Design a protein with these regions (language model features):
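Small-residue-biased structural context
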Residues: 1-165
């Protein structure tokens, strides 16, 4: 990755994949019918981190791409890729927000059986779909950004990104 923007998005992808790995571990240890102790330090930290990630990382990451990068990519002829990524963003953000909404009450009251079953299903759907999305962006979007952005535009976008974080 040559541009600051591509490197920053790559780093955000790595952080997202690390969070997804923690979520997958939790889901793998507990069947949909037998939820975890939400007061255990690891589970409590994951539930907190999920809410924070949706509000402060995933949503803003998608918004930055859609407002600052995708119009430039469309102008450069990458409209099909952009259309696919925008569609995935909408689906992924809805899943992530659902998961965060299910995690919030569990942080203080634990998981009721039906709430855990819904959390488990939403978590499983999100981990698979978001990991596949990250792969697409790593293989298609980031190289396209490197090819598209000159140093001046990269610097200007880096300033915008820093202000949004």
């Amino acid at each position: 990755m040559q541009t600051h923007i591509a490197r920053t998005l790559h780093d955000e992808h790595l952080a997202t994949l690390a969070l997804l790995a923690r979520l997958e571990t939790l889901l793998g240890r507990h069947a949909p019918t037998a939820g975890p102790d939400a007061t255990s330090p690891a589970v409590a930290a994951l539930l907190r981190d999920l809410g924070r990630a949706v509000a402060q990382e995933i949503g803003p990451h998608f918004a930055f791409e859609e407002t600052e990068l995708f119009p430039r990519l469309i102008d450069a002829g990458a409209g099909e890729m952009v259309a696919l990524l925008v569609e995935e963003h909408a689906e992924l953000l809805a899943l992530a927000q659902e998961l965060a909404a299910l995690a919030a009450p569990a942080r203080t009251g634990g998981f009721a059986p039906e709430a855990w079953a819904r959390f488990h299903a939403a978590g499983a759907a999100l981990t698979g779909a978001l990991a596949a999305h990250v792969d697409k962006e790593e293989m298609g979007l980031l190289p396209a950004i490197d090819d598209l952005l000159d140093a001046e535009t990269d610097s200007a976008l880096a300033m915008i990104l820093a202000q949004q974080r």
